[in-house]
UniProtKB/Swiss-Prot annotation:
The keyword Nucleus does not apply. It comes from Thermofilum pendens (strain DSM 2475 / Hrk 5). Residues 2-89 form the Acylphosphatase-like domain. This is Acylphosphatase. The keyword Endoplasmic reticulum does not apply. It catalyses: an acyl phosphate + H2O = a carboxylate + phosphate + H(+). Keywords: Hydrolase. PROSITE patterns: ACYLPHOSPHATASE_1, ACYLPHOSPHATASE_2, ACYLPHOSPHATASE_3.
């Protein structure tokens, strides 16, 4: 399963990316996460359906300092292009 997500709210400067990386890796989900110039966080998640859904559910709360307002999910065809979950810097 593959999901492309956009997380809105207070999600930058609150360890969102590092926390998502930790959660995704613990669940065996591959892909990436990055900050966007408009203040949102963008991520691509690939893995088993249940694991991807758990990362999305986590993103709806985020780490303790985050204030998530919205998570938009776009479902995409699985590509299997990632071997790890990493933080992209632009």
């Amino acid at each position: 399963m593959r999901a492309h997500i956009y997380v809105s709210g207070l999600v930058q400067g609150v360890f969102f990316r590092a926390s998502m990386q930790e959660v995704a890796r613990s669940l065996g989900v591959n892909g990436w996460v990055r900050n966007l110039p408009d203040g949102r966080v963008e991520a691509v998640l690939e893995g088993e359906e249940g694991a991807v859904l758990k990362v999305i559910e986590w993103a709806r709360r985020g780490p303790p300092l985050a204030r998530v307002e919205r998570v938009d999910v776009e479902w995409e065809e699985y590509r299997g292009e990632f071997r790890d979950f990493y933080i992209k810097y632009r």
